[in-house]
């Protein structure tokens, strides 16, 4: 008979994937245990088996994140509908860019009014198949974008500042970012995007 699962939780694994400790109630607790041991390791959420192997599973935090990201991706403009495909490289790129934006704490903008969030503003992601990238810009709340409650000069300055800030963040995350055709928008292409640990 094969192994049967015993406990689901956070575990600390060594470099050789050997079980070092756990279960822990959170990833932070597992990472703190790693610091306490002084030995290299990694925190993994999963099922501990009878032979002490750990089968990775999505953590509650992962599941909540994926649900939130999915909600944000639903805000993409209708022009993405014909492009979203496992075979299209832009699909992977827009998902990576969207994840980076949302991880930063910024919402995606609902450019075409698919959800009630359209007036709130956020980051616009527009496909650019000819350039093999995603055009990124900032959309302000309707109070600024439509009604210009602080005046046109302030609205224009905020638009350019926020768009540049988003571009700077994506550059820091390893994407290739360049000003798009002399506009205030930026073209984002795939670069050397790195994933960091929670301690970096």
Can you name each region flagged by the protein language model?
Residues 67-75, 98-148:
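An N-terminal amphipathic alpha-helical segment
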Residues 90-108, 161-173:
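Amphipathic alpha-helical segments
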Residues 49-52, 62, 138, 143-149, ...:
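Long, compositionally biased intrinsically disordered terminal regions
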Residues 157-191:
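Short, compact, well-ordered microdomains
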Residues 39-68:
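Short, mixed-charge low-complexity intrinsically disordered segments
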Residues 24-45, 167:
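A short, charged, amphipathic alpha-helix used as a generic interaction element across diverse proteins
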Residues 1-18:
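Short aromatic-glycine-(Arg/Gly/Cys) micro-motifs in beta-strand/loop hairpins
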Residues 16-27, 155:
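A short, exposed loop/beta-hairpin motif centered on an aromatic-Gly-Thr core
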């Amino acid at each position: 008979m094969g192994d049967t699962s015993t406990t689901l939780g956070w575990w600390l694994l060594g470099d050789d994937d050997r079980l070092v400790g756990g279960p822990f109630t959170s990833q932070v607790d597992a990472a703190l245990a790693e610091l306490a041991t002084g030995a290299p390791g990694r925190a993994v959420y999963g099922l501990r088996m009878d032979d002490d192997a750990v089968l990775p599973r999505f953590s509650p935090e992962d599941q909540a994140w994926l649900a939130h990201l999915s909600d944000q991706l639903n805000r993409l403009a209708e022009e993405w509908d014909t492009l979203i495909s496992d075979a299209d490289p832009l699909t992977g790129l827009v998902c990576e860019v969207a994840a980076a934006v949302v991880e930063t704490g910024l919402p995606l903008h609902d450019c075409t009014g698919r959800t009630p969030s359209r007036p709130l503003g956020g980051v616009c992601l527009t496909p650019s198949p000819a350039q093999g990238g995603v055009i990124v810009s900032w959309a302000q709340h309707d109070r600024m974008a439509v009604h210009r409650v602080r005046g046109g000069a302030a609205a224009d300055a905020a638009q350019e500042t926020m768009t540049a800030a988003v571009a700077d963040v994506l550059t820091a995350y390893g994407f290739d970012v360049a000003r798009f055709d002399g506009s205030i928008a930026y073209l984002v292409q795939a670069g050397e995007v790195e994933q960091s640990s929670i301690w970096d």
